[in-house]
């Protein structure tokens, strides 16, 4: 269970937009394709990404209206409130380490000695409890269930192996003065990005128990079993229209490993889209 992202992508703000440069290679295109999938549904709670050839993703900044509080921070706040002796113990034993290093040690202790000892179903409940507590009930258990369902379903379909405690959580809406579940973001390590040929082989052979995934269980199968499947109403015609508008050179897709894998996953989960259109046939008919 990782505590930080796989890649350390160079990032910068450019006006009201946030730009990320590929670190492993392929992250930007994956972010873009997953974003177009979401935009082809009625789901609204996500950060949209655009692709700048060859290796940059561009998204509107959710700041200053929203501030993101990762699950990592919520867990530490909960531990400090209900088990402050653990903080005291770690601080005494690691006086020469930085405060951030000590926070990581506390978190790691919680992961190893508590979180991993829970059933996967109980891990989900524990994180929901923490979110409801942290937000004073402004985010409900039903809100948490819908949110967890949305990102686990998305990650399962498109094989995002990097959903960690720093990229899911809650947001504070300064306009409304209240908390909400976070917008979905950070799907760059989907569609095989950062993985080796063994990973792709396991995907092709449907070996779901061998595909490593986070954050509740450690595999694709264990994660998807503990939450409800989110009913994304995918519209393949809308997807293609968006792709035509946003990507002038479709040759980029043909040169990428991600597009072939995305078509495969769409065919598995959406052999027919929400309107009854055969997804793979339609993509093929327009040259994709």
State where each predicted segment sits.
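Conserved ATP-binding subdomain of kinase catalytic cores across diverse folds
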Residues: 1-115
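Detector for Asparagine
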Residues: 8, 55, 83, 91-94, ...
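Conserved kinase catalytic-core segment
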Residues: 26, 122-196
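Short, hydrophobic/amphipathic alpha-helical patches that form generic packing surfaces
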Residues: 33-37, 150-159, 281, 285
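C-terminal catalytic region of ATP-dependent kinase domains
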Residues: 39-41, 173-288
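Short, structured coil/loop segments at alpha-helix boundaries
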Residues: 62, 76, 80, 137-144, ...
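Extended low-complexity intrinsically disordered regions
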Residues: 92-132, 207-229, 237
């Amino acid at each position: 269970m990782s505590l930080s992202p796989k890649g350390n992508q160079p990032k910068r703000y450019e006006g009201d937009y946030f730009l990320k440069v590929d670190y492993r290679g392929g992250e930007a295109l994956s972010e873009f394709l997953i974003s177009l999938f979401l935009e082809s549904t009625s789901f609204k709670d996500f950060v949209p990404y655009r692709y700048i050839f060859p290796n940059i993703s561009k998204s509107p900044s959710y700041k200053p209206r929203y501030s993101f509080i990762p699950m990592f921070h919520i867990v530490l706040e909960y531990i400090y409130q209900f088990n402050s002796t653990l903080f005291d113990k770690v601080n005494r034993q690691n006086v020469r380490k930085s405060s951030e290093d000590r926070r990581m040690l506390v978190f790691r202790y919680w992961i190893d000695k508590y979180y991993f000892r829970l059933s996967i179903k109980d891990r989900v409940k524990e994180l929901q409890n923490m979110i409801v507590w942290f937000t004073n009930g402004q985010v409900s258990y039903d809100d948490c269930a819908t949110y967890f369902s949305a990102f686990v379903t998305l990650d399962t379909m498109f094989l995002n192996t990097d959903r960690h405690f720093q990229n899911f959580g809650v947001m504070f809406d300064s306009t409304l003065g209240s908390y909400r579940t976070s917008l979905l973001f950070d799907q760059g390590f989907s569609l095989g990005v950062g993985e080796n040929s063994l990973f792709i082989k396991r995907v092709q052979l449907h070996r779901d128990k061998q595909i490593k995934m986070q954050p509740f269980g450690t595999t694709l199968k264990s994660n998807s079993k503990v939450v409800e499947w989110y009913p994304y109403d995918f519209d393949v015609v809308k997807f293609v229209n968006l792709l035509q508008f946003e990507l002038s050179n479709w040759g980029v897709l043909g040169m990428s490993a991600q597009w072939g894998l995305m078509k495969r996953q769409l065919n598995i989960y959406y052999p027919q889209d929400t309107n009854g259109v055969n997804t793979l046939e339609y993509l093929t008919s327009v040259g994709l």
